[in-house]
Amino acid sequence: MQTVARKASVERVTNETTIALTLTIEGEGNVRVTTGFGMLDHMLTLTAFWAGFDLDLTCKGDMHIDAHHTAEDVALCLGQALATALDDRKGIARVGFARVPMDEALAEVTLDISGRPWLEWRGDEYLPPVIAGEEKDLWREFHKAFASAARMNLHVSYLYGKNGHHLLESASKGLGLALRQAVRRDRQTVLSTKGSLD
């Protein structure tokens, strides 16, 4: 039996950002990301590649101010695309978990695509105050927006490390691997005793 490809496109135009993206869950890790913020491009590329997704994303934002609007709006669009592509979430494994080392750094990501948005953000004392020219809080806000739009319970824990780039890379790869597990089709029904994920 042939299954329908899970895919979604999202466009968002505001006074702060103009975003267009297409996400394919059953992809080959083909990723093209251009946001104007190189570190965000790098982390999104890692997440999509490790998830096995195809992602084509462009964003033109008010980077003359800072990267905050760009990061948050990209996260909202990415989460919306994931939620749309998963539709009623019927048949997915739903839960994913990964720990990924990057040199001296280790992060853990656990998620449940449950329909109940939540972000638990731990260990950010290991992150330096500024990474790639932006305050570290930008990354918490990115993940919060993503979890909210995807209707996902997302826990990100930085367990140890010193280099901000390494810590972010560890978490981004972990998010990709956890998503790969959670979106896997492994049954015909919704994995919930209440019969729905909302």
UniProtKB/Swiss-Prot annotation:
E.C. number(s) listed in UniProt: 4.2.1.19
Keyword Secreted: no
Gene3D superfamilies xrefs: Imidazole glycerol phosphate dehydratase, domain 1
UniProt GO MF annotations: imidazoleglycerol-phosphate dehydratase activity
Catalytically driven reaction(s): D-erythro-1-(imidazol-4-yl)glycerol 3-phosphate = 3-(imidazol-4-yl)-2-oxopropyl phosphate + H2O
Amino-acid biosynthesis in keyword set: yes
Gene label: hisB
Main location: cytoplasm
Listed GO CC annotations: cytoplasm
InterPro entries found in the cross-reference section: IGPD_sf, ImidazoleglycerolP_deHydtase, ImidazoleglycerP_deHydtase_CS, Ribosomal_Su5_D2-typ_SF
Protein name, as recorded: Imidazoleglycerol-phosphate dehydratase
Signal sequence annotation: none
